[in-house]
Each structure stands twice: as structure tokens, then as C-alpha cells.
């Protein structure tokens, strides 16, 4: 029987309402099941932490509440590992403790025991946790990440495997020192104009210049007013911070890739130019590339067979380009260390006086005598024992942060207890390890004398490890120490430095730098605001 038209509209309306209700009910069921599953999963993860050494733990929210409470008292951009170390101090946590930050991260085990750190890195040779350095892509090409994923890469690599030694770097010291004349002139100009400058930026340019000299054997003009190198470098690295935010990365990535390609093109062109200029094919200005070219011309790299006597193979050129990008970016992490060294020396004038006395006795008391000494006897840097100790103490107090490793095995033993660490992130916490009072008495004090030969209390084995050890160690540590020594030697003879933060600037804990607290607002850990400073010429 046909439905009268007068009843058609109400029936249609009723049918639509029933359809919507049914669809809504159908959607509620999987959503409810998903919520139940998530709650069960979170509860299961949280229960795994029940009997583990850890800070106060919320039954459902894990360690998010305790970290957020700590963060509320700190500057928003403070370096995250410092927050963890403050929690460790507050609750007097042992050298092995666990953090529950699921679902953002897998369970994390923090380690600040030197023996256990040695076992994980040097005995078990645990690899770095996946994705740690990939955040620097595209500034560093993916080719480099594939290279360092090979456990034996340092042996076959066409640069690192050839001449990456302290003895080779010392030969480059005279040219490195000469390249810093422009920096000294700039500091002199800022002193005349009473201008405040960013120490971290100056240190970055200085290390970029010295690393370029070591790699290419040529001056990069990093202190020129419109330097191609510093412009390309900053354009390729500045987006790193914004790209750490997964919501911003898609918007940043296209322009970042474009700037990275420009940076790589500048490096590639310089590599080719260096090869073309290497006229005698073996000898000449000491550099990492010159040593590599000498082996390449003898067909000494099976992974990169020579195409012809006068040309670079495409694969070899790309390997040298990606290596150059990685070395230049990695080396500039030392800019934060040298910046903190200037800050600490300003805060400890007696140590600064001792340091200048050492510089004068070993190399001379003015710029010209120092440059002449380094030209004739670059190994004099090895006689700067207190300078070396100052840098080691600075690295102890302000390391680059924890090293994240893959689980070397399913379990870990410590002090008679066995821990299940399957699917854990293993974090060797330098910030905690370097400030243990049983390893470094009065650990928050700046005391470089503890690192001098014959110190009353020797440093325990494997307790000082800012460059790490085993797989993933910093291959450039010898070069970094040489560069920082050269910079201290040339600047402290002529200039005094003092921090110039605004009164309203954010301030972190004094033990972590105060106004110059460490932030995560750079390629690596960086002093807040880049450490603004004023420079004054020393009274003779």
C-alpha cells in the first residue's frame, strides 16, 4: 500500500535520525575500544616501573608530572637533560635510574656510572640510538648517516681513515692561527666601539674557519663582511631548531632543503677546487683532503675506484662533500664550550691570571710573539697544561648532553641486580656523571687544577667522557681541543671579556650557568642568548 504524501516527510525525517544515531553508535564502539586499549597499554607500561629506581611516579601519567613541575620553575628553553639532572639531584637518585615517558618515548634508563658506561660503549660496543643525528638532515646529507652506521667506517673512510691524527692536526696550527687575525681585528673594533656581541657566534665563525683550514687547506674568509661560507652555513643550520617541532617541520623543510643544497654545492665546489689546485698530487699545504687525494691517486680506496688521473669520481666527490658538511657542522659544537670557557674565566680571575702566565711563559706575551712561536714550533700547544685542563673542566661542567644508545642486550647488571632493558633507550648522562661528588669532589665548582698532571686526587677511569668512547665516539676531539687552545691563546693575551645580559633576561640555575644557562636552541646545547659579551683591550 502506498504511503500518502502527507506522511512521506515525517517518515523520511525519522529514517534519517535513526541512521545518524546508528552511525554514531557504531563510531562510539571502536573509539571506546581504542580508549580502553590505550588505558590498558599505559597501565601495563607503568607497572613495569613499579620496583625500579626512579623519581616519584604517577600510576597513569608516569614521569610527566614530576618533569612538568620542575619545568615550571625553569626557563622554557632550558636544555632538557638539565631538567632530568635536577630531578636526579632533588631525589638523590642512584647512578642507574629509569624514566617513564610513554607514549612519547620508549622507557629510558639513565646511567652515570663510569664502569657501566665503559661496558656499554667499549666492551659491548653498543650503537647509537636510531635517529639521534638524523634531525640534522638535510643540513647533513643522508649519505653521511649511512656511512657512520657502518661499525668499521673509521678504518675505510677516505678522510678519517687516512690522516685523522693529532700529529697531523698540529701541522695545521700555524695556518689556523693566521686565519684568526681577522677575528682579533674584529674584537679590537668592537672594543673601540664598546659594542656588545654574541660570543657563541664569534666562536662558531672561528671554529668554522679553523675546520675549513684543516679540511681544505685554504682560508674560508669566515670573518669577511659578506662571507659566502658563514651565510651558507647559517642558512643550512638555522632551521634545525624549528624543524624539531613535528608540527612546524613540514613548513620549514622545503626552504631548508634548498639552503642545504646551496651549502653542499659550496662545499662540493671547494673540494673540486682543492683537488685541481693540488698540483704536485701529493705534497703541499697540509690538509685532510690533500692526504686523501694522495691515496686516491694511487687507487688506494677500493670503495672509491679512480676514474682517471685528473678527475674525481662522482662517488668519491659526494663522499667528501657529505663528510665536509658533517665535519663543519659537528665541529661548531665546540663554540658553546669555548664560550663557556670565557665565561668561567671571567668569573674566576685568579685562574685567568694563571692561564695568562702560562701563555706568556710558553708562547710569549703579545700577538706577534705567539704567532711566531706557533709558526716555528706548533707543538708548543702540548706544553699548555693548564689551558688543556681549563678546557677539560669546561667540558666536564658543560658537556654536549647524554649519548643515547641501543640496548646492548636484553638485561643489564648493576650492583648485584639484573634489570630488564628490552626496548629501552640507554642514556649515558654526562651531565650527571660529571657532577658526581664521589668522582669529582666539589663537582659544581670550576677547578681546572684537578686535571693537571700529578693532581692530588686522580680522575677515576672513564669518569670524564664528553667526547664519548666506543662506537659513535667523536672522531674530531683532537682537532677540537687544538682549535680551542689556539683561540684561548690568541684572545686572552689581548682582551678581557665580560657577560652582558639584560637584567630582565631569564635566569637558570647558577650551577648550570645562571643567565648563561644551557638551551636547546641551537644545533646542539647553546648558552642562552648566544652569551652576549663586551670585550675590552687589556691594559699593558
Curated annotation (Swiss-Prot):
InterPro entries: Cyt_P450, Cyt_P450_E_grp-I, Cyt_P450_sf, Cytochrome_P450_monoxygenase. It is an enzyme of class 1 (oxidoreductase). The gene is ptmL. The keyword Metal-binding applies. Its EC number is 1.-.-.-. It comes from Penicillium ochrochloron. Glycans are attached at residue 17. Disulfide bonds: none annotated. Its cofactor is heme. One of its GO terms (molecular function) is monooxygenase activity. This is Cytochrome P450 monooxygenase ptmG.
Amino acid at each position: 500500500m502506498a504511503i500518502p504524501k502527507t506522511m512521506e516527510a515525517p517518515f523520511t525525517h525519522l529514517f534519517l535520525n535513526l541512521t545518524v544515531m546508528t552511525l554514531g553508535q557504531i563510531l562510539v564502539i571502536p573509539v571506546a575500544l581504542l580508549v580502553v586499549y590505550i588505558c590498558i597499554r599505559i597501565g601495563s607500561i607503568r607497572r613495569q616501573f613499579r620496583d625500579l629506581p626512579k623519581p616519584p611516579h604517577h600510576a597513569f601519567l608516569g614521569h610527566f608530572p614530576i618533569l612538568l613541575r620542575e619545568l615550571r620553575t625553569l626557563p622554557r628553553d632550558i636544555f632538557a637533560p638539565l631538567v632530568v639532572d635536577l630531578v636526579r639531584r632533588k631525589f638523590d637518585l642512584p647512578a642507574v635510574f629509569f624514566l617513564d615517558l610513554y607514549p612519547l618515548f620508549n622507557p629510558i634508563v639513565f646511567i652515570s656510572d663510569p664502569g657501566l658506561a665503559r661496558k656499554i660503549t667499549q666492551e659491548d660496543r653498543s650503537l647509537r640510538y636510531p635517529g639521534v643525528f638524523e634531525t640534522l638532515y638535510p643540513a647533513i646529507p643522508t649519505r653521511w648517516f649511512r656511512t657512520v652506521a657502518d661499525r668499521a667506517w673509521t678504518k675505510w673512510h677516505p678522510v678519517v681513515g687516512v690522516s685523522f691524527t693529532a700529529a697531523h692536526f698540529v701541522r695545521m696550527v700555524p695556518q689556523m692561527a693566521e686565519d684568526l687575525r681577522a677575528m682579533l681585528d674584529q674584537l679590537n673594533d668592537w672594543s673601540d666601539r664598546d659594542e656588545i656581541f654574541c660570543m657563541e657566534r664569534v666562536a662558531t665563525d672561528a671554529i668554522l674557519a679553523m675546520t675549513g683550514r684543516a679540511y681544505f687547506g685554504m682560508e674560508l674568509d669566515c670573518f669577511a663582511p659578506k662571507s659566502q661560507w658563514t651565510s651558507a652555513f647559517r642558512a643550512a643550520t638555522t632551521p634545525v631548531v624549528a624543524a624539531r617541532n613535528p608540527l612546524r617541520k613540514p613548513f620549514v623543510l622545503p626552504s631548508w632543503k634548498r639552503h642545504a643544497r646551496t651549502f653542499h654545492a659550496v662545499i662540493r665546489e671547494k673540494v673540486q677546487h682543492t683537488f685541481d689546485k693540488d698540483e704536485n698530487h701529493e705534497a703541499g699545504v697540509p690538509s685532510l683532503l690533500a692526504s686523501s687525494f694522495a691515496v686516491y691517486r694511487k687507487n688506494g680506496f677500493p670503495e672509491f675506484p679512480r676514474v682517471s688521473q685528473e678527475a674525481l669520481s662522482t662517488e668519491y666527490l659526494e663522499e667528501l662533500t657529505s663528510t665536509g658538511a658533517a665535519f663543519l657542522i659537528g665541529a661548531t659544537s665546540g663554540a658553546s664550550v669555548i664560550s663557556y670557557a670565557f665565561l668561567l674565566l671571567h668569573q674566576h680571575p685568579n685562574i685567568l691570571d694563571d692561564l695568562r702566565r702560562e701563555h706568556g711563559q710558553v708562547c710569549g706575551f703579545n700577538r706577534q710573539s705567539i704567532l711566531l712561536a706557533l709558526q716555528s714550533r706548533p707543538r708548543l700547544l702540548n706544553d699548555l697544561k693548564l689551558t688543556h685542563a681549563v678546557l677539560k673542566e669546561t667540558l666536564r661542567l658543560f658537556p654536549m648532553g647524554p649519548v643515547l644508545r641501543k640496548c646492548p642486550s636484553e638485561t643489564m647488571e648493576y650492583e648485584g641486580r639484573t634489570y630488564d632493558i628490552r626496548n629501552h633507550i640507554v642514556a649515558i648522562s654526562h651531565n650527571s656523571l660529571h657532577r658526581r661528588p664521589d668522582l669529582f669532589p666539589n663537582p659544581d665548582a670550576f677547578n681546572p687544577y684537578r686535571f693537571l698532571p700529578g693532581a692530588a686526587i686522580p680522575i677515576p677511569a672513564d669518569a670524564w667522557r664528553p667526547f664519548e668512547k666506543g662506537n659513535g665516539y667523536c672522531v674530531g676531539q683532537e682537532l677540537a681541543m687544538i682549535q680551542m687552545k689556539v683561540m684561548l691563546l690568541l684572545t686572552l693575551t689581548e682582551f678581557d671579556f665580560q657577560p652582558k645580559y639584560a637584567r630582565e633576561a631569564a635566569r637558570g640555575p647558577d650551577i648550570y650557568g645562571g643567565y648563561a644557562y644551557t638551551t636547546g636552541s641551537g644545533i646542539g646545547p647553546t648558552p642562552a642568548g648566544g652569551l652576549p659579551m663586551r670585550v675590552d683591550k687589556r691594559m699593558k
